[in-house]
Amino acid sequence: MAPQTETKTGTGFQAGVKDYRLTYYTPDYQVKETDILAAFRMTPQPGVPAEECGAAVAAESSTGTWTTVWTDGLTQLDRYKGRCYDLEPVPGEDNQFIAYVAYPLDLFEEGSVTNLFTSIVGNVFGFKALRALRLEDLRIPVAYCKTFQGAPHGIQTERDKLNKYGRGLLGCTIKPKLGLSAKNYGRAVYECLRGGLDFTKDDENVNSQPFMRWRDRFLFVAEAIYKSQAETGEIKGHYLNATAGNVDQMLKRAQVAKELGMPIIMHDYLTAGFTANTTLATYCREEGLLLHIHRAMHAVIDRQRNHGIHFRVLAKALRLSGGDHLHSGTVVGKLEGERNVTLGFVDLMRDAYVEKDRDRGIYFSQDWASLPGVMPVASGGIHVWHMPALVEIFGDDACLQFGGGTLGHPWGNAPGASANRVALEACTQARNEGRDLAREGGDVIRAACKWSPELAAACEVWKEIKFEFDTVDTL
């Protein structure tokens, strides 16, 4: 880089450009409990040292810029700058490194995921010295966690509201996702709920289109919920998507859902944005509504292993911003998800404390303090034959959503729902009796078919359906 040149004798300021690593690469730095820590996967351009790239990431995501500026002398850079404090090569990869960066807590606004992401990933990903950059993980210190309220209610409060214990929850996304009238949509909801599901769901792109305006959908769905509750004696819900083109309209839809007595609403948190999501989570907490979160657009951000943001970071951001449910992948269905990695961020969603575990992609131990847990939602290409694996992988504190796996039943929606409910309860009972679902799951399902014709029909339809493709994003 160009040498420094002094512009005025006696000022102590030297104009020019200097290497980032002279200021922002500090391998002797001892991280503080209050630091926000980030793990970046870097791919430097040929000829650019890893130390310079790591320092550039730290600089450009905190106090630095491309040239020396005289206003650096007006602040305490050592107090406010980000620091690249460690580098490690990625095993099995040429010219890839994990850069560990520590950020002082004072760089971030309290209770603002928007500001957190604007600072850490807002600009640095376009830096020319890097061929690719991916944010693999964040350590959120307890001091910063305590500035957020997180989930409106959390897992235990949700179970208390629904009076459902000892098993996973069952859901279904109504299909076709677009094109149904509000009345036919409500009918599909009713059939699924009376058949044994706990929830039905708007798809992520169901908002307020010409074929079905939001208010009409809300009214027919409310009718379906009250009718199915009266028939079954169970509390039912439907994830009414309150996502809208502006925050005022979003809150209006949430208010109507509340006035109709609905227990839960839904939000697309990535497409709508963190500010909108935190606003809605605050409303839901105050008004007693559960909040289901869909991750539409996540794969644009997280699927490529060398560039973007890993979903575990997006999941942590959601736990801060607020949501009672979050889609997490299934491991066994049609959507991307490696088992160890998925289990890693599922624990980060649910547990109060998670230890560092690189085998599961967890770069830092994470203490969530008192932030409520978020229930993972397994959805996408799953059916009754997947139930043993889902129960074994996710346990009880999860919502298992079978869209096509309910609505595609040859006898209709209600029998499809019944088949899933029987399969879930059979697998839960078998697990509680000490049986190994990974090894005996097929036998458990086949035995349950003998006293559930609905399940037997579902098993016959989907006996050959598998989604066996290599995972793109691996450790």
From Swiss-Prot:
Reactions the enzyme catalyzes: 2 (2R)-3-phosphoglycerate + 2 H(+) = D-ribulose 1,5-bisphosphate + CO2 + H2O; D-ribulose 1,5-bisphosphate + O2 = 2-phosphoglycolate + (2R)-3-phosphoglycerate + 2 H(+)
Positions of the propeptide segment: 1-2
Entry keywords, A to Z: Acetylation, Calvin cycle, Carbon dioxide fixation, Chloroplast, Lyase, Magnesium, Metal-binding, Monooxygenase, Oxidoreductase, Photorespiration, Photosynthesis, Plastid
Residues holding Mg(2+): 201, 203-204
Note, other: The basic functional RuBisCO is composed of a large chain homodimer in a 'head-to-tail' conformation. In form I RuBisCO this homodimer is arranged in a barrel-like tetramer with the small subunits forming a tetrameric 'cap' on each end of the 'barrel'.
UniProt-listed HAMAP family: RuBisCO_L_type1
Protein name: Ribulose bisphosphate carboxylase large chain
Originating species: Ostreococcus tauri
Record gene name: rbcL
